Amino acid sequence: MDKLAIQASPPLAGDVIISGAKNAALPILMAGVLAETDFVVSNVPNLRDVSTSCKLLRCLGADVDELGEGKIRISTKNLNEFCAPYDLVKTMRASILILGPLLARYGTADVSLPGGCAIGARPVNLHLHGLEMMGAKIEVKEGYIKARVDGRLKGAHIFMDMVSVGATENLLMAAALADGETVIENAAREPEVIDLANCLIAMGAKITGVGSATLRIQGVERLQGCEYRVMPDRIETGSFLVAAAVTRGRIRCLKADPASLESVIAKLEDAGAKITTGEDWIELDMEGKRPKAVNIKTAPYPGFPTDMQAQFCVLNVLAQGTATITETIFENRFMHVPELIRMGATMELEGNTCIIQGIESLSGAQVMATDLRASASLVIAGLVADGKTIVDRIYHLDRGYEHIEQKFQGLGAHVERVQ
């Protein structure tokens, strides 16, 4: 099984090209099921979850051609299966996003209950409740969600009890082909939801309120394929910016989207980073200084993203001062803390808050990745730890970061993949 071996590295320096956003690419690939003609998606990152999504679409009978350079073509003319099996779904929570498109277009879907990162309950009840309001008959048995609808789904007024990105995306896709108007209130406002909505509009969907907490979807008879480019990955961008800050370096993230990262950029500036942005690039310069501790509280967009929490834990571990990090989105999302403590970090958990006393340095150690973003934080910690750090179970990392060791090497980091 692959591991990453990391040696203490110099301050990161240079340019890094940001990949397409995993969390936008996955729902957009699932949206291909809604299209009656060929659908081409570009800027798709080469990741394990993307490969799993393509396998799932092929399992349903869709023709999926990987055209190279991050471009994928999907044709549904031979789609004739409506079951997303356990073997595929167990490795990736985003598989649940096939439910809405299958049900809306074909009236039937059997989807295994999902797997993915082990970071809390992430219930699917919001997805199911919304689809039931649109007329679906749903039962959960033998580990599968079995959904049926006679004719077409019907437009409905859906109020989400809590903000959920996945449920918003599933209901948005289902509503695009429903009969009549659907209103989704308390909808997620994440940039990836906006990207999906813009993709659906390019396919012929009628959606208003994009980017707000109230989405209005006027169902249409059919959707056509189009060519669509996935947005840049804001979490990958943020991860490299934090790595540069922790190593007191200076980097530029190219093909990035500064507008989607405002909360992260603000916290990096609070930590002492000098940040300059252009339309599609972000430069961070620590000017050789140690970062200052910053308090973080995660929140739905436009608040601070939960997917950047672990990386800022590492920043605060090596910062000047004491900080608190409060996680409000997922329970069980501090699994990186015991690993960082093994490297010498001074951290204490109190409920959903981590109290961190900044120290001068860490010690290299063998550590274990527990989920996608926790693994990124351990890599960043390894860059500034004395001696050698081995990060085990990096299949988590490969689910969300494209060519991570090559990108770090390009910035001067001592990182290599080993068996």
Curated annotation (Swiss-Prot):
One of its GO terms (cellular component) is cytoplasm. InterPro entries: Enolpyruvate_Tfrase_dom, Enolpyruvate_Tfrase_sf, MurA_subfamily, RNA3'P_cycl/enolpyr_Trfase_a/b, UDP_GlcNAc_COvinyl_MurA. It is found in: Cytoplasm. GO terms for biological process: cell division; cell wall organization; peptidoglycan biosynthetic process; regulation of cell shape; UDP-N-acetylgalactosamine biosynthetic process. The keyword Cell wall biogenesis/degradation applies. Pathway: Cell wall biogenesis; peptidoglycan biosynthesis. Gene3D superfamilies: Enolpyruvate transferase domain. Keywords: Cell cycle, Cell division, Cell shape, Cell wall biogenesis/degradation, Cytoplasm, Peptidoglycan synthesis, Pyruvate, Transferase. It comes from the Bacteria. Its main location: cytoplasm. The keyword Cell division applies. GO terms for molecular function: UDP-N-acetylglucosamine 1-carboxyvinyltransferase activity. UDP-N-acetyl-alpha-D-glucosamine binds at residues 93, 307, 329. The active site is at residue 117. It catalyses: phosphoenolpyruvate + UDP-N-acetyl-alpha-D-glucosamine = UDP-N-acetyl-3-O-(1-carboxyvinyl)-alpha-D-glucosamine + phosphate. Pfam families: EPSP_synthase. The modification 2-(S-cysteinyl)pyruvic acid O-phosphothioketal is found at residue 117. Phosphoenolpyruvate binds at residues 22-23. Belongs to the EPSP synthase family. MurA subfamily. PANTHER family: UDP-N-ACETYLGLUCOSAMINE 1-CARBOXYVINYLTRANSFERASE. Cell wall formation. Adds enolpyruvyl to UDP-N-acetylglucosamine. HAMAP family: MurA. This is UDP-N-acetylglucosamine 1-carboxyvinyltransferase. The gene is murA.
